[in-house]
Amino acid sequence: MKTMKLFCLMTLAITVALCPQLAAQVQTDVPQAVPGAKPVSVEHIKVHGTALEGNLEGDAADRDVFVFLPPSYAKEKSRRYPVVYALHGYSIGAEQWTHEIHVPQTIEGAFAQGAQEMIIVLPDSKTVHNGSMYSSSVTTGNFEQFIAHDIVAYIDAHYRTIPNRLSRGLVGHSVGGYGATRIGMKHSDAFGSLYIMSPCCLSARAAGSLKLGDEKALEAVKTPEDSEKLGFFQRAQLATAAAWSPDPKNPPLYLDPPMKDGAVQPDVLAKWAANAPLAFVDQYIGNLRQYRAIAIDVGDQDGLRMDAGKLRDVLDKYGSRTALKCMKARTRVRWPTVSRIM
């Protein structure tokens, strides 16, 4: 429980906002100034992802990363710090997310209120079609490996971290919550705690959710500029296909869409279903048992709450120490509320 408390203090420094294109259940308030809060240092760096090299859709292997260093970092030269890696959701990048969650003000306030000082890292995983799904694909590159190994290795090599898994937390919201779930299941060698917020895409997608109009819109996409003209959910289908049904023999997008010639493609949907964590969680229970703490957060009127509950139930069945918190539905989440649910 001590570890859970420490991890929750760590994640107190980070809260979330749903991307603006979606009907938001929660929004973050601009934080009030906390007496005695000291400024953190912000470094905007580029990290090369070996795992992303040669991806077919041309996404950059050099990724933007925002690193937030605690107030004592510059003065206490011999001190080392735990690290939290935070994964943004679909359609936004790391820089936009920092504005939506009011970083660095939130971090400064959390430290002033007693959260243990740590390094917080926000990597950018936005792609041609607005999101990598934090997965592994020849089309997008191996973002799973990039997060779990490339970035971790870089941060450990260039900053004064405590370089072991028990001093690393992985946090994500929405698609980032999916990423934290997926990567967390497969890479317990890299992280010691998981905090999963409103995770999407935990269960397989039903064929009935696909529309003929979407097929025609997707077929018209030949360039990244064409992709930018799509509606939110249409573009998300391209991102999903690029990540989960890549096809190196199908230019220019190098993916297989879920519909073709007016018909659902069952083989493609089977590939998508194979990437649903609820379908493969049982294979990684040994890894999940390695975590000191796993927490899941979701709104009590969030459409994602059922799948989040199912994930918690599976973990509980196997004896994993998992906390599930359901926030009361509201349009704004205030910081005292966030503090109480930690």
What are these regions (language model features)?
Residues 1-6:
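Positively charged n-region of N-terminal signal peptides that target proteins for export
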Residues 20-24:
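Sec/Tat signal peptide C-region and signal peptidase I cleavage site
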Residues 25-342:
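Non-catalytic cap/lid and distal C-terminal segments of serine-dependent acyl enzymes
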